[in-house]
Amino acid sequence: MNPRLQDSYDEFDRQRRVDEPAKSAVLPGTGTEHRTDFARDRARVLHCAALRRLADKTQVVGPREGDTPRTRLTHSLEVAQIGRGMAVGLGCDPDLVDLAGLAHDIGHPPYGHNGERALNEIAKAFGGFEGNAQNFRILTRLEPKVLDATGRSAGLNLTRAALDAVTKYPWQRGDRTKFGFYGDDMAAAWWVRDGAPAERPCLEAQVMDWADDVAYSVHDVEDGVVSGRIDLRVLADDDAAASLARLGAEAFPTLAPDDLLAAAERLSQMPVVSQVGKYDGTLGASVALKRMTSELVGRFANAAITETRSVAGGGALHRFVTELAVPTLVRAEVAVLKMLALQFIMSDHGHLGIQADQRTRIHEVALILWGQAPSSLDPLFAPEFVAAEDDGARLRVVIDQIASYTEGRLERVHEARSPRPLD
């Protein structure tokens, strides 16, 4: 039997690509490792620099907007918490799903999806840019932790099951816009996916993906309400609900407009939603809003657990034993909330103007770094640029450096190296 299809995590799942030497700083008599392999994986992600940098990377609005900003880091913490709770209910290893939540956006560049778009434009002729593929590249190559026998970086050297848990799209680019591996990372990808069903994410990755959808939909709407951009009472307006349903049907072709209209109606009639009313920042309004976010997260997470259990039965569910099942009505409700954020935050005219400026800044920084490389590159990246065999590989190094930047650093590099206008 293929070891990846067995009913428990085994040595195959816990294997690391590179053998690691015993720790040398251990006090005599204290050398026993009390953590599981997956707990160690989680700790490696939690302590890595790439995760910390997410504190200055945009979720929906900028990390320096407002007094209680959500950043890519806080979003990742929320995804990890939601996913961990779901893992307990399903029988997945909680540390695996937790670390997948922590790492699921670790490859995001400055300005979130907008920065991703800009870097994809720059790298279009050389394999493109995709945040999920960058996740894998960071974890298996770019984040310094372990060296292989040739002295090359093996990234964090996570276990096979951990890397698979972070992989939402287990395929190369091809003609698809969403993908999980760049061409020059395929040796690591083949190792991770050895024996796995073709193009099927493991259950832990599916749980992480749904936890991401739940956190994204609920918490981004919460931020929109607090900022005054979203008024939840629009859900009860027929015209507004119809508009959200049209948007949702375009974004999620598997959902019918009638399902989305019904979802908007259900949401509007939920007491925890209607009680938020016109948010005014008072104690009562803040408590009502927090109650809504808490109950919706629980509703969406528990629905997936219950539906999956109804299909797969009891016992521990993990890896490729089953797939995550989510009721259509719940998928529709999450889609409606996503469309609220899209329509009232991300499609705002002022927001679109800011995004255009951000993309221009990334393009200009790429030109600056490319024109002055390798001296313009950090010590981690400059040797890779020098060793690269062609322009595509050299450009990938420049892309790696830009993707690693916080928004603050990107703006400092742009300001310092851009020509200043004459007074």
Swiss-Prot record:
Family: Belongs to the dGTPase family. Type 2 subfamily.
SMART domains from the UniProt entry: HDc
Superkingdom per UniProt: Bacteria
Gene Ontology process terms (BP): dGTP catabolic process
Region (Disordered): 1-35
Record-linked CDD domains: HDc
GO molecular function ontology, one term from the record: dGTPase activity
Listed name of the protein: Deoxyguanosinetriphosphate triphosphohydrolase-like protein
Ranges of residues in domain HD: 72-217
Keywords associated with the record: Hydrolase
Pfam families, per database record: HD, HD_assoc
Extent of Basic and acidic residues compositional bias: 11-22
